[in-house]
């Protein structure tokens, strides 16, 4: 048994050389906090306490191999909730929290039918349902293992979300008032410049699109959204690639959407589209 500071020093020694000081520090804080059930303050004030850390060596070996810390732990935080994640789900990002926050700012607790396309871990659908209990929310994805993870998260948090296996490029969607999606949007040519822990460990199908048709999923979703005339307006909320903001505005307008709003994330990068169709 060693003191917490000894474990911290050993972890830091190996991880700084791989990830750099800042990212190594963030990884250690998340890793130790989860495994030892300690808050960030505990990790400081209890440094000289002896602790039992049976998974330390196995965890460190995975981290040295560039496995994302969230996959080592099997969980990722989103809206302060620890969602189950695995090799079949995209790891939730802070930018997606901003998308959810933007939706909650724009829509009240009035009854809405909402669909989350490419639901992954279910973090968007579940976070929306817990914040807006009156909404009827469906989450769809193309792989059963992904749907299983989303269902596990819904059960964990007591969220009433209907998760369905659906290939959105081939199948229709249930009726909805609001369509939300963080679909694949990274051109495959960008993979070579991305971090190894993303490219090698997160599902390609959740990340990449063909170089020649980077807006593939958005076009299909807008087709589905406008396929049938509704008596009431419908809305879309998308997370997008930072380089395609203007193209997305034009695409939405070409399908008859109005009030198309492009928003930036906290890094001041074009990241979200909110648009309305019909009156």
Residue positions per predicted region:
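Glycine-rich, flexible loop/turn motifs
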Residues: 39-40, 65-69, 74, 79-81, ...
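S-adenosylmethionine
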Residues: 135-136, 140-279
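A general structural signal for well-ordered alpha-helical segments in protein cores
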Residues: 8, 28, 56, 66-69, ...
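N-terminal auxiliary segments of SAM/dcSAM-dependent transferases
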Residues: 1-73
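An acidic site on a long C-lobe helix of protein kinase domains
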Residues: 52, 92-95, 217
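SAM-dependent Rossmann-like transferase core, predominantly class I methyltransferases
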Residues: 57-133, 137, 143-152, 274
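Short helix-terminating capping/connector loops at secondary-structure junctions
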Residues: 21-22, 109-110, 230-233
